[in-house]
Amino acid sequence: MRKKHRLPFPILFEDEDLIVVDKPAGLLTTHTKIVGRLARESQLTAENILNDYVRKGQAKSKKRVWLVHRLDRETSGVMMFAKSEEVAEKFRADWANLTEKTYRARVAGLLEEESGAFESHLLEDADGYRVRSVAAPDARRAPRGAKTPRLARTEWRRLSTADGTTLVEVKLKTGRKNQIRVHFSEAGHPVVGDEKYGGERASRLYLHALSLRFRHPRTGEWMEFTAPPPKGLT
């Protein structure tokens, strides 16, 4: 007998190729760096929850989902998973041309301009915990095996201001780790609640993946899904 699955987040769309969900803040997208398969599978992550969902309680089922992109643990909003490795690879190979992502963020301070953009090369620290902007890389001088800085572009538009903060709509032209958080922090306007990058403590990280627009890998149709923003980001 198959057990019923009550997911801790809503499914926004599902078909034979994809699952689109509204991930809550505080939930890992995928496992952290824990050694061993059993340890990875025991972690409470969106990936593991959806693996259990597609297997419908059948322990021997080989069905699973594939990671296409990530959201930080503290970030809520729209996420997409593939139901096959082939579909996942299609998106990974041409992510910038097949998708458009829009975020909402509340940042410290008052942004004077109505809109703007940040562009820099981002580099992860050796342990992968933090990210920072660095000079454009010179491949000829890079030590063998060293991490390579990757170009990142963040476009934003001011929506409103309140209590010494600014609500912004953000569009990513690239999808680098912690990209929005790093760019606004380095501009002197860290995301509210982002203690990792210099923001003041708050009830949550005020960053939300508002919408995801993508070209369906099978039909070629453009589709868009939205996750309602939480309190403080409306």
Residue ranges and their predicted role:
Residues 1-234:
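RNA pseudouridine synthases
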